[in-house]
């Protein structure tokens, strides 16, 4: 159930009748190369959360579209402080609990949000019913930024993709784990310096078919995770 557009009496009745799982998608607004929209992270996590919520009959909250994206400057980004995102989630979860919903799953769609979400989790460690996950950890492939994975997913869910502008970005093929780890740390400080064009991976062979496969894999694994948690 999408909470937006619901009516108070119906919502309170549903909460009273059965324990609910609230789903909070968290994305970002930031550059995704010349071929994907700046809303890519939010678009993907919203779609995955929507499909997941239908599978478990959960309550889908509006996506938090603003994340921590300073590392993409001077390419375009709309970023908030780490403390801001953590406090916002704390307030939203507190309000949900006050209204009778204590089982809360936060689905993250942006790598740069991780530190803030980990901080939030530490503060909420006593509450086993509040869980933070990143959707890309539920697929059996290497994640990227505007590369094959994200571009394929966007082709599966959106018409707002300019494949004619897609170009290969920074790739880690042949690099050791230590080298990749070092590059990752550099990218967290300045993504444009590492990638050049804002792309991590190769989007040129992306397809909607692969995107649909990835989405199904992620959603099915999220359902399994939810069953184990709640």
Describe these PLM feature segments.
Residues 1-103, 111-230:
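Extended, histidine- and acidic-residue-enriched regions that form the cofactor-binding/catalytic faces
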């Amino acid at each position: 159930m999408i909470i937006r557009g619901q009516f108070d009496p119906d919502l309170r009745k549903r909460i009273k009748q059965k324990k609910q799982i609230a789903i909070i998608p968290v994305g970002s607004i930031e550059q995704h190369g010349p071929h994907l929209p700046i809303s890519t992270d939010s678009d993907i996590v919203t779609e995955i959360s929507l499909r997941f919520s239908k599978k478990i009959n959960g309550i889908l909250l509006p996506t938090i579209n603003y994340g921590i994206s300073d590392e993409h400057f001077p390419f375009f980004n709309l970023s908030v402080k780490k403390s801001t995102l953590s406090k916002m989630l704390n307030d939203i979860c507190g309000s949900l609990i006050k209204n009778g919903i204590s089982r809360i799953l936060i689905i993250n769609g942006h790598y740069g949000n991780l530190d803030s979400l980990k901080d939030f989790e530490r503060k909420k460690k006593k509450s086993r019913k509040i869980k933070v996950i990143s959707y890309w950890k539920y697929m059996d492939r290497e994640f990227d930024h505007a590369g094959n994975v994200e571009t394929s997913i966007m082709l599966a869910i959106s018409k707002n993709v300019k494949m004619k502008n897609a170009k290969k970005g920074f790739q880690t093929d042949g690099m050791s784990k230590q080298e990749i780890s070092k590059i990752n740390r550099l990218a967290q400080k300045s993504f444009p310096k590492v990638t050049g064009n804002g792309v991590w991976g190769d989007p040129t062979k992306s397809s909607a078919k692969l995107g649909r496969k990835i989405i199904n894999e992620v959603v099915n694994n999220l359902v399994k995770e939810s069953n184990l948690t709640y």
